[in-house]
A protein has these predicted regions:
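N-terminal Sec-pathway targeting helices
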Residues: 2-22, 27-30
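Catalytic glycan-binding domains that act on GlcNAc-containing polysaccharides
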Residues: 32-220
Length: 220
């Protein structure tokens, strides 16, 4: 059967359209990976550029003020939020459940949070306390210990408030250059295990943080 010129043209247009769709899908996938895929090595360069652009100057200012290492803070922002601004938030259902248990008296405490801290907290407030905020993705309930407001760690003051929290909670470990412990503390609240096996959500969280630190140290 002979193919008419019109049919040939239609096949060409169909092929070209398919190629465009495939190219668009690849481009969208690549953009998403570079924005959200800070855990993929090819996207790390983009995460570093975003972190430098969005937070570099302010982090440097407050790192000097609180005597907390600049490379660590920058690496932590890249790990936790990919350098995005606004940094976004992440609700943790299991934390919400623990806080609700504390409020109802079924649990004596959750870390430093006691029932007295949650007496006036409604469900919306508990959800905010169970959500991580800002470039350092600090959990809302961490504010209670330092008498901060959630708006302090998610708004315009997020960088300063986050660095203050780090300074007061595990800043001594950073000043002693115990960076492996510091990354593990930020993510889990515990020192890096003596077994050598981290308990972070991402098994390579600490390793990536240390590697990012080296890159930021070279840029200074």
């Amino acid at each position: 059967m002979r193919t008419t010129p019109l049919r040939q043209q239609r096949w060409k247009w169909a092929g070209a359209g398919l190629a465009v769709l495939l190219l668009a899908a690849l481009l969208i996938s690549e953009v998403n990976r570079r924005i959200d895929g800070q855990w993929n090595r090819p996207g790390e360069w983009w995460g570093m550029q975003a972190t430098q652009k969005n937070y570099g100057a302010e982090v440097h200012k407050w790192s000097v003020h609180y005597n907390v290492p600049f490379p660590y803070l920058m690496a932590l922002i890249q790990l936790e939020s990919g350098g995005r601004k606004p940094a976004g938030k992440r609700f943790e259902a299991h934390v919400f459940e623990r806080l609700m248990e504390v409020k109802q008296g079924d649990r004596s405490h959750y870390e430093h949070v006691t029932q007295a801290d949650l007496q006036e907290a409604n469900e919306e407030a508990l959800r905010n306390l169970a959500t991580s905020w800002g470039p350092f993705q600090l959990m809302g309930y961490k504010c209670i210990l330092l008498d901060l407001q959630i708006r302090d760690i998610r708004g315009q003051d997020a960088v300063r408030a986050g660095i203050e929290w780090i300074h007061l909670t595990y800043g001594d470990a950073l000043r002693d250059k115990k960076f492996q412990d510091a990354f593990h503390l930020h993510n889990t609240g515990k020192l890096f295990p003596k077994s050598g096996k981290p308990t972070t959500f991402h098994p390579d969280y600490v390793e990536k943080g240390l590697r990012f630190m080296e890159a930021y140290d070279e840029k200074r």
